[in-house]
Curated annotation (Swiss-Prot):
<feature type="signal peptide">
    <location>
        <begin position="1"/>
        <end position="18"/>
    </location>
</feature>
<keyword id="KW-0732">Signal</keyword>
<dbReference type="InterPro" id="IPR038765">
    <property type="entry name" value="Papain-like_cys_pep_sf"/>
</dbReference>
<dbReference type="InterPro" id="IPR024453">
    <property type="entry name" value="Peptidase_C92"/>
</dbReference>
<dbReference type="Pfam" id="PF05708">
    <property type="entry name" value="Peptidase_C92"/>
</dbReference>
<comment type="similarity">
    <text>To E.coli YebB.</text>
</comment>
<protein>
    <recommendedName>
        <fullName>Uncharacterized protein YiiX</fullName>
    </recommendedName>
</protein>
Length: 202
C-alpha cells in the first residue's frame, strides 16, 4: 500500500516539472553539420546550433537559420541533433504574452533569409545564433549574449583552420562581429528549463 501511494505521489508531481514549450524559449543542440566540430573547437562548447521556440497553431516549432531561415517542428529539430541531445533556456521569470507575441512577429522579418556561411553581421543572410540574438534585440531590446570579434575565438585547431580557409581563403575577417551559440547560452537573463527531456506530449 505504501509503495502504491509513493508511486501515485511521484506521478502526480511529474507535471509540475515537465517542460511546457513557450514562444521565446531558446534551444541548443549538437548539430550534425560539417561545420559543427569547428564551432565546438573555436568556442570551447558542446553546443553548435541554436534556435528559438515559436508556438504556431498550438504546436511547438523551432525558428532556426539552416538553409533558409524557417520553422522546423520541435520533435524533428531534436531528431536532427547529435543523439537527440538538447538543452532549453528561458528568460528567468518567464516572458509575458505580449513579449512572446513581439518575438513571434519580429521573427517573421527574417523568414526565408539565406544561411550566412561567412558569419557576417548583416541582415541579408543569417546564421543560427545571429538570428536568435537579433530577434530578441529588435523585439524586446534584450541582448541574449555578448557579441565578440572573430579573432577572440580559438582559431588554432586544424579543423577550424580548414573551415576558415574554405570560407574565406586568405582573407579571414578577424574583426568581424559575431555571436556564438555559447554566448547566447551564457546570457545572464536565461535559466535552464529542460535538458534531454525524454517524454513528449505533443
Amino acid at each position: 500500500m505504501k509503495n502504491r501511494l509513493l508511486i501515485l505521489s511521484l506521478l502526480v508531481s511529474v507535471p509540475a516539472f515537465a517542460w511546457q514549450p513557450q514562444t521565446g524559449d531558446i534551444i541548443f543542440q549538437i548539430s550534425r553539420s560539417s561545420q559543427s566540430k569547428a564551432i565546438q573547437l573555436a568556442t570551447h562548447t558542446d553546443y553548435s546550433h541554436t534556435g528559438m521556440l515559436v508556438i504556431r497553431n498550438k504546436k511547438p516549432y523551432v525558428f532556426e537559420a539552416v538553409g533558409p531561415v524557417k520553422y522546423t517542428p520541435l520533435k524533428q529539430w531534436i531528431a536532427h541533433g547529435e543523439k537527440g541531445k538538447y538543452v532549453v533556456r528561458r528568460v528567468e521569470g518567464g516572458l509575458s504574452v505580449e513579449q512572446q507575441q513581439k518575438l513571434a512577429q519580429t521573427a517573421k522579418r527574417y523568414l526565408g533569409k539565406p544561411y550566412d556561411f561567412s558569419f557576417s553581421w548583416s541582415d541579408d543572410r543569417q546564421y543560427c545564433s545571429e538570428v536568435v540574438w537579433k530577434v530578441y534585440q529588435n523585439a524586446l531590446g534584450m541582448r541574449v549574449g555578448e557579441q565578440q570579434k572573430l579573432k577572440e575565438f580559438d582559431l588554432s585547431s586544424p579543423q577550424v583552420q580548414a573551415k576558415l580557409k574554405e570560407r574565406y581563403g586568405k582573407n579571414i575577417p578577424l574583426e568581424e562581429t559575431v555571436v556564438s551559440p555559447q554566448a547566447v547560452f551564457d546570457a545572464p537573463q536565461l535559466t535552464t528549463v529542460a535538458k534531454e527531456w525524454p517524454l513528449f506530449s505533443w
